[in-house]
């Protein structure tokens, strides 16, 4: 049975599209057939993060206009045979497609893939409603900032109103040193505020920026970095595996203790 998941946030710039790209690649590496749908019409970026921007010929709009079949619009990733992208049109606004059309696209794909992952545009307007319409599950991406958490709370309420059966949370850009200084909200406090299950924690790491600029998802590295491992673990949890969370706070404390010992000559 396939799964249709929308990745959303409410607030822009929290790492939603980066999450979509890495989860798709990680699931493909686990042997799952995955299609990523870029639902951010007019502002598509998913193709860039996957390094597929030069291979786009048709988009979802062309499929809906009967200018091509959906198979022709799918962009294959030569590095990962199980991963394909259905790109958004870059020259259209977010209202270029409606909820029924989004459901039609998903209907054409659902018998061919194990996972259909929809990259939702930021905000809670028409683009959000369209992306959410065919989804069975949702992953909320937030950062440890009050504005992002408040927006995530609003989105959770909207998802529940749409009868989305399963909602999970990813906390991105965690900085343990700021949490310890009470300059950043802790993961525990975010969970208390949002009251949805946690599926992943990602550190604030420059490797994520480097990978997005290169168009190479972190999970495709031969030797996984810490954020790459965190993304891989999220994919494995989606598959039902019981994977412990990386303890970034403990790792930070261990580093501090090492520095103190060196300074004190211990």
Swiss-Prot record:
Residues that span the membrane, as ranges: none
Entry-linked InterPro entries: AAA_dom, MinD, MinD_FleN, P-loop_NTPase, ParA/MinD_ATPase
Protein's membrane topology: Peripheral membrane protein
GO molecular function, one term: ATP binding
Record-level GO BP terms: cytokinesis, division site positioning; division septum assembly
Gene Ontology cellular-component annotations: cytoplasmic side of plasma membrane; cytosol
Disulfide bond entries: none
Compartments it resides in: Cell membrane
Binding of ATP, residues: 11-18
Keywords tagged on the record: ATP-binding, Cell cycle, Cell division, Cell membrane, Membrane, Nucleotide-binding, Septation
Family to which this protein belongs: Belongs to the ParA family. MinD subfamily.
Subunit structure: Interacts with MinC and FtsZ.
Function: ATPase required for the correct placement of the division site. Cell division inhibitors MinC and MinD act in concert to form an inhibitor capable of blocking formation of the polar Z ring septums. Rapidly oscillates between the poles of the cell to destabilize FtsZ filaments that have formed before they mature into polar Z rings.
NCBIfam families according to UniProt: minD_bact (TIGR01968)
Protein name per its UniProtKB record: Septum site-determining protein MinD
Organism this protein belongs to: Synechocystis sp. (strain ATCC 27184 / PCC 6803 / Kazusa)
